[in-house]
């Protein structure tokens, strides 16, 4: 399974000007994307009301950004507000490694060795914690796959180590025109999701555009874009979020993120209905109670609502 990239629609080209590309549909600005047609304003207001109802139902704060890359139509809700990022960063780490660390095409095949303590300190380690991997190490490609497809915290930290720490993610995002997304700490500390925390956060609009640039834009070389997309399509953690909310025949290239504090539940990526251009979709959520439960159905329902509006 793979994503196919359709050219921008004629209407979008006219709106953006001659020479517009898929990357042009994903502007760097932090403002929430607005629908390109005033005729769709009532629909946009309707979707906002339904998203507010979901917030009330789940006692949560919800942020959504969606963009149809074929038509330029979009929907957003709290798209400029900051939310904890959690494990969503792992896709950015893999992308940064592909672009910057593997520039000479050596890292993916290089065997990376690490100590048992290094990965155990990270928490969730379904792949890096295996005895055979601790003993023999893992290749760069295996670490990327473990971080993105399995959300392995140890693999995420090992990729951060290659990027000279969490601030490497921030620098990478700035190089893409994303002035909002930032990472400051390692796993598992980065998952503390206190209200008003700025560190280790992003916004639905910023992270959505960044994923769009990476997956259907030109931020990565074609081969690297294909590798990253493959790891995202192989995601094993999205069954209760995007996979639960979107039709079974849609291709999903997404990364989840969640935490035990403040009930964080996130999913971000590019999704493709059959026969249509891809949709950029980000859904971020958090609770007001530090012991609030993680409600993946909230993410699934929000994704279904906005995707339904655009298709």
Curated annotation (Swiss-Prot):
> Which Pfam families does the protein's record reference?
Beta-lactamase2
Q: Name one GO molecular function term.
A: beta-lactamase activity
Q: How is it modified after translation?
A: Predicted to be exported by the Tat system. The position of the signal peptide cleavage has not been experimentally proven.
Gene Ontology biological process terms in this record: beta-lactam antibiotic catabolic process; response to antibiotic
Return the EC number. Answer: 3.5.2.6
Catalytic residues, per the record, are 87
Lineage top rank: taxon: Bacteria
Residues annotated as binding substrate: 255-257
What InterPro entries does the entry give? Answer: Beta-lactam/transpept-like, Beta-lactam_cat, Beta-lactam_class-A, Beta-lactam_class-A_AS, TAT_signal
Catalytic reaction(s) noted: a beta-lactam + H2O = a substituted beta-amino acid
Give the signal peptide, or none: 1-34
Keywords noted in UniProt: Antibiotic resistance, Hydrolase, Signal
Q: What else is known?
A: The class A beta-lactamase family has a specific amino-acid numbering system, sometimes called Ambler or ABL numbering and often misspelt as Amber. A multiple sequence alignment was used to derive a consensus sequence and then the consensus was numbered taking into account insertions and deletions. This allows use of identical numbers, e.g. for active site residues, despite differences in protein length. UniProt always uses natural numbering of residues, hence there appear to be differences in numbering between this entry and some papers.
The family classification in the record reads:
Belongs to the class-A beta-lactamase family.
Q: What is this protein called?
A: Beta-lactamase
State the organism of origin: Kitasatospora aureofaciens (Streptomyces aureofaciens)
